[in-house]
Amino acid sequence: MMKLRILAILFVAFAVATSYAFVAPSSGGSDRAVAMADEPKTDEGQKKDDEKGDKEKEAKEKKKEHSYRTKLDARGRKTPAEASQKKPKYKKWKEVLEDATAQEGLFKIWTKREDVFFELGEDQFDKPYLAILSLSKGIGTRFVLGGLPITDLMFDFHRVEDHVQIRMLNTLFRAPDDPELENAIELSYGNSILAQLPIESENEKDKKILVNMNELFLSDVSDMGYFLQLVLDKPARLDSKKAIYRKVKAYAQNVEVDALLTYSPMDRSGLYLPSVPDNRYMELGVHYSIHMLPSEPMKSRLADDRVGYFLTAYKDFTRDGEEDFFVHYANRWRLEKKDPDADISEPVKPIVFYVDHTVPKKYQRYVKEGIEMWQKAFEAAGFKNAIIAKDAPTPEQDPEYDPEDARYNTIRWIVSDEPSFGAIGPSRVDPRTGEILDADVLIEQSMLTSFRLIYRRFAGPQATLMEVDPILTYLADPEIDPEAARRLELEKKLDARMDLHFGAGFSEGLEFLHLALLARGAMEPGMDVPEQYIGEALRWVVCHEVGHTLGLRHNFKSSVSTPFDKLNDRLVVGEIGMTGSIMDYAAPNVSRDRSRQGFYYSPSVGTWDQWAITWGYTQIPGNKSAQKEAEALGSIAGEAHLKEHAYGTDEDTYPAGAMDTLCAIFDLGDDPLAWAKERIGVCQDIFADGKLEERVVGEGGSYLPLRYAVETLLVQEYLAISRAVKYVGGQFTARPHKGDTGGELPMTPVPAAQQREALQFVIQNAFMPGALVLPPEVMNKLADNKIPDWQNPMFAFGRRFDFPLVDWVAAIHNALLVQLMNPMLIQRVVEAGYKADDPYRLSELFSGLTDAIWYNNMTPSGKTAVMQRNLQRIYLDKLVTMTVKPYTGLPHEAVALARLHLTRLQTRIDQASKQGSLSDEAVAHLLESKSRIERALDAKLQAEY
């Protein structure tokens, strides 16, 4: 160990000694160097040495840095010279488009594997285009059906430095020819940025740029995620990794892009979608049709509230001298005469509809006839061959034909797992002018081939009634019934002209016609409905939906144009139509007198249709302003008072505030009460015939059709009875302008005598013992379907296999009382006391209901006792609610009357419950009712009203 230490000391000493020996010699020799090392230095000398040392140190650091950077260069780092050069702003044009294929058209489109690039020039920025979005592939259920429109919007491309914004343009606020106000509008109202896309490359020669459109086309810009939440009641998220293109096509005036998108529900609990293989992944097709708007905007036509057209509206802030800022244009096609001086001329460009290849061959002729039924109306407006039906071309005839291409107006056939809407006729318009640019009609197969509504067996009678009678949706309290709130939101999303309730009501009408034909022996059990009947119905449906595409709204008042006693006169109906307008929802015409049966559905457009088309499409000579043209058309609109021009639309019919007695769906004739009585009579005749089972089931057949027949008859009875409800608290409305001939007032209360008659009709046919009941021998034969499938699971939770007649009757009773005791109806009854000399008073309504439901049958007995007790409970519920927690808008008089009737009823119940001969069920019902009344009378009001 000692030896190792000695060796270490010697090694260190040797190293120190040799370090002196290897000092670099100066010019003065080694001795001089050693001497300088030992010699003390002056201050100036020390300073020079320090400066020299600093320079040497700096040189070493630079050499070290250079060596380090040289090594980094070998790894791909830029040299200092290269780093000083300006970095390219975009990728090279050729680099981006390597292996890409090009299409020339409205935009030059480059496709490269999964990417789609638009090539944009300076002249394409800040220029409005129209985008039309539709579903090209659905899931076959819940309104998510291929072919349905999604939305349409006006947008532009706006460059902001290194990006391009796709802006949805705000067309709602304008100030024509006023730059200062335009600046103010721009300050106050903005656009919506749909996407902001980075510029991929810029062509050095022509300065055109490339943008990758994936962020737009493969995104949820269609808002289908929210739509799925509405229809499924579950939020859904787009899986962007699974988004692909199915088709990208460029044409001279339009671009068609079809994307396949996968959405995943974020919550699958309780979600049952048998039409989707795996409901974790819902595959939807979204089609984008991008159009150049007309370079010369169509001359707009100012709307007139006396004529029913869809509108394009905006606020014009230059109208500060008018009653409001709104301008309304009627939506119309650009139809111009070849010969402007001729009374009747062919158009320069007719409206052409193609009957798509999806329409079954056997129905195509009826579809064409439905389209061209409008020729009659256009001839009244001065046009010949204005609307033409054509077969869709084959690929050989027109390789570019595509029903999703907005250049083609089509009639298409779609299938769905369950009926949704029946048929729809959406159109797309130029938001600047109201010009209709494109339209399509979609028809659901299930509307014709599956008359009965599949969901009946699962949703129950209450849901069925809400489907066929949309007013029940509007009357439901959204706070109490979230399903009603969801339904209303869905209708807003889909569009008013979508005819959501049409499919249900039309299917019920067809089922009733089918049943009537069976009952009359015109068909054998098990037979398909003869094509002539289906064809008649289909022709009417197509004509109705094409009417929407021409700009026309619903006209639910038009049935009053045809006299009730002429409904089965084929000559009269062939000339003026079954109703004044094909835009009505008409019930099938089934005469109680079989020997006088006329058309089942209208064979012609009506008098209102011809008048409305005349107003909308007549060419006014000269180059008049929109205001001058409106004045010239005033003479046509001034004929609105004529009976054959009666008009009332959705808002006059559906909402709780709809008050026009004559605006209703699925009725016929100018006397609604007479029609309702006849329809009830037809239903009762079918029951009373005694051959219903024989005619419907047949020898060896299943009993299931008998069950469907009973459901159909109950729905038809409800629709007829509810038709009378609109008389109570009703008014006759009109749209006169001051100076119009006819002398109509905007509102006239229904005479009290008619209101009393209507209420008695409701009581007699719905509330009296024996109403809405079935022959006992039929009840045990109403078997349900016992063949399982995905729509008919055998082990559905809570499902009943016997027929729930008690539930059906209770649902009808509740639906009728909801309407009769609606706050707005009650408001009108209260205010009628001021308007009329002999008013129908609110006390009459309450007394009429209380007498019929309670006092005239205090202790129900017999087979219908349970139904009567349910009716009493339902009515009592409504009186209690009015007393304890009245609905918003309920007049004070109604609350006071409800309390009065509860007080009187309490006394009567107390007396009745002491009878000794009552059943336990009757006593229990009376005591429970008495207890509820006592609690209600003792309770404090829970709401301000």
Per-region residue spans from a language model:
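Positively charged n-region of N-terminal signal peptides that target proteins for export
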Residues: 1-6
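Bacterial N-terminal signal peptides
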Residues: 9-19
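Signal peptide processing junction and immediate N-terminal pro/mature segment
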Residues: 19-39
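Auxiliary tRNA-acceptor-end handling modules of aminoacyl-tRNA synthetases
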Residues: 34, 47-117, 121-359, 377, ...
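Structured segments of extracytoplasmic/periplasmic soluble domains
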Residues: 99, 373, 377-381, 414, ...
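Conserved catalytic-core segments centered on acid/base and nucleophilic motifs
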Residues: 362-381, 531-559
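Conserved catalytic/binding loops enriched for acidic/polar residues
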Residues: 520, 528-533, 558-945
